[in-house]
């Protein structure tokens, strides 16, 4: 039941056009990467309810104004995501987080990849994702 609630909702949009859906299409458009995930004994398990509670508490903490206040304003923040990641609800969830950070005066750099799903480092365009991340890292400058 819990597995269906967690993974089923995430995969729903990708099952409509796929009679052979395996339940994990939401992770990536790269079928080989999805298969690796399915074959890995440490992936795809249903977390304990307490673990989920901690995960959801962390999501709330990431947007809590008192916690955000403690993030150094000079800390560079890079956020990347696929536009088809169901976890972000059409980017609404991630934009809510970004707005909370920006309202605090934090500087964020964002990169959204069209049609990308949940695991952008395992997507069909992962080379671009990695290249953009490395370019951002190489352009950082820190004051000492």
Predicted features and spans:
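Alpha/beta-hydrolase-fold enzymes
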Residues: 1-42
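Active-site nucleophile elbow and catalytic-triad environment of alpha/beta-hydrolase enzymes
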Residues: 47-69
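Catalytic active-site module of serine/aspartate enzymes centered on a nucleophile-bearing elbow/loop
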Residues: 62, 102-144
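Short, conserved loop/helix-junction motifs that constitute active-site signature segments
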Residues: 68-73, 104
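Short beta-strand/loop motif that positions the catalytic acidic residue
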Residues: 79-81
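Conserved alpha/beta-hydrolase "acid-adjacent" motif
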Residues: 84-96
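A general structural detector for well-ordered alpha-helical segments in enzyme core domains, enriched
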Residues: 93-100, 129
């Amino acid at each position: 039941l819990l597995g269906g609630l967690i993974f089923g909702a995430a995969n729903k949009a990708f099952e409509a056009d796929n009679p052979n859906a395996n339940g994990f299409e939401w992770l990536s458009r790269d079928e080989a990467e999805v298969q690796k995930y399915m074959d890995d004994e440490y992936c795809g398990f249903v977390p304990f309810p307490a673990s989920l509670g901690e995960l959801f508490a962390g999501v709330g903490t990431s947007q809590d104004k008192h916690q955000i206040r403690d993030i150094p304003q000079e800390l560079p923040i890079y956020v990347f995501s696929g536009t088809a990641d169901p976890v972000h609800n059409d980017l609404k969830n991630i934009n809510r987080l970004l707005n909370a950070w920006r309202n605090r005066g934090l500087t964020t750099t964002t990169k959204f990849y069209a049609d990308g799903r949940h695991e952008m480092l395992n997507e069909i365009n992962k080379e671009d994702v990695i290249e953009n991340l490395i370019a951002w890292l190489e352009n950082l400058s820190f004051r000492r």
